A protein has these predicted regions:
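Acidic (Asp/Glu)-rich catalytic clusters
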Residues: 15-17, 53, 95-101, 127-146, ...
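A short, flexible beta-alpha/helix-coil linker loop
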Residues: 28-31, 111-112, 150-153
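Generic enzyme active-site microenvironment
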Residues: 81-82, 145
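Surface-exposed cleft-lining segments at the edges of enzyme active sites
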Residues: 115-125, 151-159
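A short, conserved beta-to-alpha structural element at the edge of catalytic cores
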Residues: 101-123
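Histidine-centered catalytic micro-motifs
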Residues: 23, 27, 143-151
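Alpha-helical scaffolding within the catalytic cores
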Residues: 6-10, 90-92, 120-139
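C-terminal active-site subregion of NodB/CE4 polysaccharide deacetylases
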Residues: 2-81, 87-90, 156-253
Length: 253
């Protein structure tokens, strides 16, 4: 299996390629108190992974998907991402990913190690991964990416905070994991040209958004929200409609 630290080969002279399918998850666990609809149950996640595999698809990290695309491969790959770095990833998501032969990118908050989702005013307090938990996920083959230091809206950050959330978070994670950190994920999915430039200057090879609007390129990759209500039929529709609704991404094959 390719290393999750692979970076896609330079593609700036290529014509835009089809938009990659990148699934966005958050927490895996109890959905009974979930005001933001960010949690999927372990049973639902397993059904979704089973659906992927039965369609001949395999979930991988974003870095692995982009590296495969740069080689002209990866038609059978989709990227799986888990935002915020919830502690339930180790006990609930990781065993299922392993069972179904998948990997994923885990976007974590090195400024909140062992903390909780204090940025959410509603819903239960959910514990976040500790430094040891992040290292365990990396050792299991997951790509570790940055979600910023503390989960702030980068479009509202001043210059000093913007640099801390992008460049400093990357440095902290690289020291923590001992491996290069090439991926970033914009908190709340909010992004503008200034945030993109800060992420690029911080040395990230790619960054994930949700709906980047008119922005395009490897530092504003769109993603598909996956939730508890996404049955096989809904997954099929999301998979098919994604490429129809999204413009090709500049800089990708």
């Amino acid at each position: 299996m390719p290393s999750f630290v692979e970076s896609p080969a330079p593609t700036r002279h290529l014509t835009p390629g089809p938009v990659p399918w990148i699934a966005m998850y958050h927490s895996v666990g109890d959905c009974s108190d979930d005001p933001y609809h960010l949690t999927v149950s372990p049973d639902r996640l397993e059904r979704q992974l089973r659906w992927l595999r039965r369609r001949g698809l395999r979930g991988v990290s974003v870095a692995e998907l982009l590296a495969a695309r740069a080689r002209g491969e990866g038609r059978d790959l989709v990227a799986l991402t888990f935002d915020d770095g919830y502690a339930d990833f180790l006990g609930k998501a990781l065993p299922l990913l392993t069972r179904w032969g998948c990997t994923a990118t885990l976007f974590v908050l090195p400024g909140r190690l062992g903390g909780d989702n204090a940025w959410d005013p509603l819903g239960p307090r959910k514990p976040l991964l500790t430094a040891d938990g992040i290292r365990r996920a990396a050792a299991a083959g997951m790509e570790i990416g940055s979600h910023g230091l503390t989960h702030v809206d980068l479009t509202r950050a001043d210059d000093a905070l913007l640099k801390a959330e992008t460049a400093e978070s990357r440095a902290v994670l690289e020291e923590l994991t001992g491996t290069p950190v090439t991926g970033f994920c914009y908190p709340y999915g909010t992004v503008d040209g200034r945030a993109v430039e800060a992420v690029r200057e911080a040395g990230y090879a790619y960054a994930c958004a949700i709906d980047p609007g008119e922005l395009t390129g490897p530092h504003v990759l769109p993603r598909v929200y996956i939730g508890q209500n996404d049955t096989a039929v809904r997954l099929f529709l999301k998979y098919r409609l994604h490429r129809l609704r999204r413009r090709p991404v500049e800089g990708l094959r």
